[in-house]
Amino acid sequence: MKTAIILSLLSFLLHIHTNAQNTIKGRVTDKVTRQPLESATVTLQQRGDGNIINYTLTDADGRFQLSSSSLKDRTITVFYMGYRKKTIPVLISRPLTIELEQEAVLLKEVQIRPGRVWGRQDTLKYDLTRFTSSKDRNVSDVLKKLPGINVEENGTIKYNGKVISNLYVEGMDVSGGRYNQINNNLKADAVQAAEVIEGHQPIKSLRGKTFTDDVALNLKLKPEVRSQWIYTVMAGGGYGEKALYDASFNVLQLSRNRQTVYTYKANNIGRNLFSDQQKLASGNSFDRVTDSNPPIFLPLPEPAMPLSQKRLLFNETHTASANRLYRLDEEKQLRFQLGYIHDRTTRQYGSEEIYYFAQDTVHTATNRHDRLKTDCLNGEVNYEDNAASRYTRENFSFAGTWKSGVSDITGDNVIFQKIKNSQWELKNYFNQLYTKEKYTWGIRSYIRYTHLPALLTVIHRNLPVSSADNRLIATCIHRRDELNLPDNINENTYRTVTGQTYESIPTEYEEMNIDNAYTDNALYGMRKKNGVNYQLTGGFRGELSSVRQENSYSAPRYSFYTIPRIEWERTDFLLTAAATVWWNRLPKQSYSRFYAAPSLYFRYKFSPRWKMSLSGSLDESEGGIQDIYPFHYREDYRTVVKHTGKVAVTVRQLYTCYLEYKNTVKEFFWTLSASYSHNRYNLMAERNYKDGNFYLSSVERNHSSYSYALNTIGSKGVYDWNLKTSLELTLARNEGKQLNENIVQNYRYDYLRVEPKIVWAPSALFEVEYKATVSCGGSGIGEDTRLDPLWDVAQRLTLSLGFHDTDFRLSGEHFYNDLSKDQHLNTWLADVSLIHKSGKWRFTASAMNLFNKEQYRYTLYSAVQSYTSWVKLRPREFMVSVQYQIGRASCRER
């Protein structure tokens, strides 16, 4: 309450000192046709030095609006592709009409064709009508075809290897970063163009003042779609090992004044719906808060996914979401979001693991059957007032997650494990910023509270009993919730379920309840003069963690910090230097530390096509409560954790180099990045194995680790062939130390990954998509142990044939895996589908896993271990579905 009062008073005091701004309004049109020019770039500049004061893009009617504290010595400059640049002085504050003339380009005997990709300054535009085909189902399918853009399996969008910070539709973010709800539900042919905005600064009062490296993507809809409510219903059924279902219903309305997205989806065919509720975009960097993640002591098992999840996921999932965004006026927006997901998942897998310790090599083998249940409810309210002279953001969110995992584990012993793990969380973020001429100042506050109750139950069946007895015991425990039985199973409970008696079963319980509160509050200010931006931030961070086990334990910590920062920017280069000065205090550990964390960044543009950057930083951090918790606890059925209670300190040096080239005319994009990291630690993790358990602890011992990485991405589009190709190459090496039985071992892990992709549509009748991943990893442990490099190759080829309104699609996958130096495995998988479209109807028949492969095996290395695993695949399955979509004009738009 005190914090809220202080924030309100500061906001009020800041507000009363803000002077009125001069607003410049205008319209940009073609000089000959008088037609409005949409998305023209309009900049307000200082006469003489050319410094940008503010900038914006014109709307569909060619209109724009800019604000400035003064109109003295200001000019307006307008850029638009295919037109001459025009600069006019700003004399009085009145509506402007700016007419642009088309550029006449005379080229002898050269045929000029409009391109699919073009750009000016920091905005790159893709004409999606040149990329979309009748075989594309949604926007995500089209984005995969764009040169320079990559869409990962979970829907994450990257431009030149960088994750986008925001995805907009008509300049508005209705999903709040959960953009799969847009890309997976919006029709492919509904979008006119996609705009990539580099150096994206959504806060108007900071444009032209401070540097940002964010990249945003804006989707421009076709005019007839903006005024529509789009309803889509899909229902499908089929059969595999059991009856299958797949259903969805979504409603979209994406106008420029308000936007709505309602969705409901359900399936048990292996389609992961969690990504629809996942925030894939982090938002603008100025509003980004560094938060220490809530501590989780008893995590649920999360096995690796070596294949696409549709091959491995045995699920029953239902999800629903509602998103509503209102544009209150030109500067204010209000957004509501609510989502819920219910999921039941089963997994069957096993692993043979080898741990290479200093004095011994440990072999373990397990087979598991996991049953996971998840319920998650989340909501968010976001208000923004984004004007040229001020910026206000108030964001409140909540999330509740209830998880329960039951595992039947066989190997050397028969073990039953159950973990209940919940998380309830409240967050509030507030930012108030003001700008007056060259000065900017504001306040920022973030508060989070998290409650995490968790319970682990492990039942060991080490006694020589029959498999029938084991099945009865498992039945007893598995039906506990169904029969409303207590967690502590006794003989009477067992007799209730099975009608029999049994000996005392060795049972272990671990119950931990964690409360974690975190806050970060700061005052900041900046001044830009002669192209140099001087910034100063000062703030306070605090965290209180409380753990209730057999004993109660709390660990408060707090920090005071100040960040002086300088940005020196010219037309071709940018230099930033900062030094975060910290004073950290952990009173319970009697720990205090004062240190500085400097950083340096340099960027140079050789030309509009070439640019490079260099960076270096030194940082220091302390471990979380998991590292200083002084009591032992069982993390799972075979892992026991016990730390010393000492504060873990990590000092990190990071150096990066980045080179980029892009040629929009030739549709060619290329990046090269290299990094080197050196970490120094005061504590070393020790892992020992005894009596079927791994014991994890930490001891005071200084040591270091190193990592090197090289990554390059090339993407090329060919207009005449309707072709996109891309290639990504990654090389990495990690070096460090491990501790076992008080003996230190060095280790080194090397990794290579090559990922080519091809999308080719030579005609409307035929389309080919090819993707491959070639990877190789090898380890060296100690002086004598060398793990032979193993190759893994995954290839997928998809062929699509179209005949009028019918498409036939065949997809084949081949996996080559080295299981050892002398043993390898080939796996073939195939799917087929037939799609018929008739008006607003879409009919689909499909068959998955045609060869009915039951299992997939693979071998992987980590730094100090190797494991050969198997996982159960979804069987051969057949599905039919029907989809119907209609669009209805909005009453307000008509």
Spell out what each predicted region is:
Residues 518-520, 551-555, 559-561, 648, ...:
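Outer membrane beta-barrel strand-and-loop segments of large Gram-negative receptors
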Residues 32-46:
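Short, ordered, surface-exposed loop/turn motifs in non-cytosolic proteins
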Residues 48-63:
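Short, acidic Ser/Thr/Gly-rich low-complexity loop/linker segments typical of extracellular
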Residues 753-776, 784-890, 894:
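Conserved C-terminal beta-signal and adjacent last beta-strands/turns
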Residues 24-30, 62, 98:
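A short, amphipathic beta-strand motif
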Residues 46-51, 73-88:
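A short, solvent-exposed loop/turn motif at the edges and junctions
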Residues 207-209, 273-279, 346-363, 404-413, ...:
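Outer-membrane beta-barrel translocator domains and adjoining extracellular loop/strand segments
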Residues 21, 61-63, 84-94, 115-406, ...:
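Membrane-proximal, glycine/serine-rich, low-complexity loop/turn segments characteristic
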